[in-house]
């Protein structure tokens, strides 16, 4: 019995020997050649340098910074290749302040064999790697920080994984990761960068991210707050549900990307926020391209509130239901985009707000284009109090594809500074369509053209209290249909120069025009900018002649007695750049005068001819008046002398002008090729002007003299009536008082061959009577009262050159600014000849 027991004991011991002999433990790392298998660092405050490659099939961590081993420095030069399970190239375990610098590549083949892993409790590690990390095992991450804080990782090289995420941070805070290189992953749930339940980390990457399997995101933040991610490079995903940038249940993060996002799978969104709120900010410069169905460019859903997304680039999608921008059940977000949205799939809207999303703001500078059926440019469904501004055009070509569609949505504010063009001819592709929607405000500064024959605007009977504001630039092809009753309003804010004749398809709107009268029934109004400017036109017509005659009076005040002829030519330009009140006018003319001989009191006769053109407004809200005018008169330059120390002159002028008034009229009933027409009417004006001017010289010395003049004229004008299209403008009598005060100084050179002068003046025009113009629109009488009182402040500089005793040439320039913000520059030149 005893021998039997000994026999089996010896056998057990023998069997146990091989087991004991094959069990190995990593040795302590030591400076010099790299270990053949693995080593550990278990002490503190040591610097190591290892040189050489490691190629091992161990299942241990190859180089391990052990627990409690703090403030060590390891310089590693060489490559590391491992084949075993859990065989990480470098691991850190519950330690602080260690530094790793590696130049070389890492290749692992086993499952859970990360390139670099920080186990829980690692702090203040500083990792610098120049080289690539390649893993092929399941859950073999390139770099993994697990419950570790305040570490810095810097890598120059690429990460490639087959069944794992490239860089992952789990429950880790305040880490800094810098990477120059690309990340490529294969396998399901193999993300490029993943930040899970982690806070206040900073990740910076220069390079591309590419994922090739299901639910593999480029950048993922899950349950993570206050992180900053900076990426310069492209993100590419190829399978279903693989989003480019994905935030889920994450708040107050900042993601900055310069590069493109390309997704190919079903439901693979470019930028996706789900249940993420409170000041997440995503700034992207680059394009988003999706080629899978239901793959949205920018998508916010499930209570993703109060986030900011800024994108400079284009969004392009090519499959069904692939919207450009979608906000679903999310509030108070701001999306700002500079770029275009283009979709080609059925039901692929440009911008979609849906399912109770409220108080969101979308600012877009760019165009929206859709080409498939039921693909609206902007679609609001069951959402309230949102604001959308598009500085660009919306174009749809598919059946039942509206440009702007509001359904069961209230109190939204939408501004389109561009055109809305639809071209489907099936009867349900209105540029703007509302149903079951109330109290919305829509502002349009461009075309609403239905090229397929639908209405340009259509409101169904269940929509009330909506307001459409039409700015200058708006035009319409197709009727303005309102089946919701007179609580819906059309407000025309196009300026005084706009004219329109718009059909409302037999429906009735509340109509408003912010500048002038409007006739109800259909929406009709006539531009009145020329009427408003009539007082200025009268002043401008007489002003160049007054300047010439003032100069003539100065000659007599100086004691001269001119004889012969004189000729004066001038050109003036008016402008007012005030928005919606623009004026651009040009007037040029010539005055020829002759001094009558053998008269006891000096007398001159004169004839003036002027051509002018005045443009009002811009674009489709524009008026033009062209005039040819002739004035003739008698001038008495010294009717009385030594009156209060000066001379008194008098004049009387009579004349007439032929005028052609042209208006651009918006008309939505001209077919599908044009939205406006031009109408014009000719009329004749007559003028009578009589006035006097007092002029005196003072502080006169040999070569310098000062002058002061005060003048006033009474101008009586009459415009005959005329007809232009549906507009009939009644005749108008006008009485205007023009007054002026002018100070001048003249300098003569020693040889008295050149005079140089300056002039400063204040003038006023006051319309005593006739400031109201009566007219008719399609037989309905209305009226408009124009400007009746303006001041003009002028400054001038001139020179005169004496050719001989009987001839001189002169040129004068004058700049004026009116109290109505009209600026004027006039150049005046001519000659005086005594023969």
Give residue spans per PLM region.
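Membrane-insertion modules used to breach or fuse lipid bilayers
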Residues: 588-590, 642-662, 690-694, 700-720, ...
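Transmembrane beta-barrel architecture of outer membranes
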Residues: 140, 164, 190-192, 216, ...
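Extracellular/surface-exposed low-complexity segments
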Residues: 4, 16, 22-36, 447, ...
């Amino acid at each position: 019995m005893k021998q039997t027991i000994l026999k089996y004991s010896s056998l057990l011991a023998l069997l146990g020997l091989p087991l004991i002999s094959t069990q190995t433990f990593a040795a302590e790392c030591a400076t010099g050649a790299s270990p053949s298998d693995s080593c550990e660092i278990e002490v503190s405050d040591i610097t190591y340098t290892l040189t050489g490659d490691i190629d091992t099939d161990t299942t241990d961590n190859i180089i391990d910074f052990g627990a409690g081993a703090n403030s060590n420095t390891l310089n590693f030069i060489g490559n590391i290749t491992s084949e075993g399970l859990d065989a990480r190239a470098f691991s850190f375990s519950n330690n602080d302040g260690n530094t790793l610098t590696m130049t070389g590549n890492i290749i692992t083949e086993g499952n859970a064999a990360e390139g670099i892993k920080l186990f829980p409790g690692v702090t203040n590690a500083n990792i610098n790697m120049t080289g690539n990390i390649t893993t092929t095992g399941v859950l073999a991450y390139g770099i993994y920080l697990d419950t570790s804080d305040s570490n810095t990782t810097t890598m120059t090289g690429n990460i490639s994984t087959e069944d794992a995420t490239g860089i992952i941070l789990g429950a880790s805070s305040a880490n800094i990761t810098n990477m120059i290189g690309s990340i490529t992953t294969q396998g399901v749930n193999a993300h490029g960068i993943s930040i899970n339940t982690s806070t206040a980390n900073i990740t910076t990457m220069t390079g591309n991210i590419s994922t090739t399997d299901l639910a593999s995101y480029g950048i993922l933040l899950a349950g993570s707050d206050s992180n900053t991610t900076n990426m310069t490079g492209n993100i590419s995903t190829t399978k279903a549900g693989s989003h480019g940038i994905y935030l889920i249940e994450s708040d107050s993060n900042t993601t900055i990307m310069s590069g493109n996002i390309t997704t190919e799978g079903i439901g693979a969104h470019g930028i996706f926020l789900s249940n993420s709120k409170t000041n997440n900010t995503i700034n992207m410069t680059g394009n988003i391209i999706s080629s899978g169905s239901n793959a949205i460019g920018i998508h916010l859903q499930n209570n993703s509130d109060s986030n900011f997304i800024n994108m400079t680039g284009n969004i392009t999608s090519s499959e069904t239901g692939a919207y450009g921008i979608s906000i679903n059940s999310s509030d108070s977000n701001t999306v700002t985009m500079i770029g275009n949205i283009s979709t080609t799939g059925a039901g692929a809207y440009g911008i979609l707000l849906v399912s109770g999303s409220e108080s969101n703001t979308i600012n877009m500078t760019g165009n929206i284009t859709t080409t498939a059926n039921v693909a609206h440019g902007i679609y609001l469904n069951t959402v309230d109090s949102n604001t959308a501004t598009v500085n660009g055009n919306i174009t749809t070509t598919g059946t039942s594809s509206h440009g702007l569609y509001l359904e069961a949505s209230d109190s939204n504010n939408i501004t389109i500074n561009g055109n809305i063009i639809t071209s489907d001819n099936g009867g349900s592709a209105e540029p703007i369509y509302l149903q079951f929607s109330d109290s919305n405000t829509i502002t349009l500064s461009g075309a609403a053209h239905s090229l397929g024959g639908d209405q340009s605007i259509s409101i169904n009977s269940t929509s009330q209290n909506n307001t459409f504001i039409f700015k200058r630039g708006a035009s319409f092809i197709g009727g303005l249909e309102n089946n919701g009753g007179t609580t819906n309003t059309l407000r025309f804010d196009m300026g005084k120069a706009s004219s329109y004749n718009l059909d409302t398809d037999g429906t009735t709107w509340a109509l408003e025009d912010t500048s002038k009268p409007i006739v109800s029934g259909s929406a009709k109004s006539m531009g009145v900018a020329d009427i408003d400017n009539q007082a200025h036109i009268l002043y401008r017509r007489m002003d160049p002649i007054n300047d010439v005659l003032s100069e003539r009076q100065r000659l007599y005040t100086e004691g001269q007695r001119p004889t012969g002829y004189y000729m004066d030519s001038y050109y003036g330009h008016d402008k007012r750049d005030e928005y919606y009140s623009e004026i651009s006018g040009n007037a040029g003319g010539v005055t020829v005068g002759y001094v009558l001989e053998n008269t006891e009191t000096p007398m001159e006769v004169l004839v003036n001819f002027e051509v002018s053109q005045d443009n009002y407004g811009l674009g489709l809200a524009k008026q033009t008046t062209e005039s040819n005018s002739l004035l003739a008169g008698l001038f008495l330059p010294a009717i009385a002398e030594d009156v209060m120390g000066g001379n008194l002159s008098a004049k009387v002028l009579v004349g007439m002008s032929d005028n052609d008034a042209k208006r651009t009229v918006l008309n939505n009933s001209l077919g599908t090729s044009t939205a406006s027409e031009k109408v014009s009417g000719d009329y004749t004006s007559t003028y009578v002007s009589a006035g006097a001017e007092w002029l005196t010289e003072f502080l006169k010395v040999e070569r310098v003299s000062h002058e002061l003049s005060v003048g006033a004229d009474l101008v009586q004008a009459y415009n005959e009536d005329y007809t232009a299209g549906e507009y009939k403008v009644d005749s108008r009598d006008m009485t205007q008082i023009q007054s002026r005060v002018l100070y001048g100084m003249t300098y003569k050179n020693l040889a008295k061959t050149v005079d140089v002068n300056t002039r400063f003046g204040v003038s006023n025009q006051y319309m005593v009577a006739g400031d109201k113009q009566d007219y008719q629109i399609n037989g309905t009488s209305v009226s408009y009262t124009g400007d009746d009182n303006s001041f003009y402040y002028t400054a001038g500089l001139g020179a005169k050159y004496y050719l001989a005793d009987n001839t001189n040439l002169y040129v004068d320039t004058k700049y004026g600014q009116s109290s109505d913000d009209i600026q004027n520059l006039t150049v005046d030149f001519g000659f005086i000849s005594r023969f």
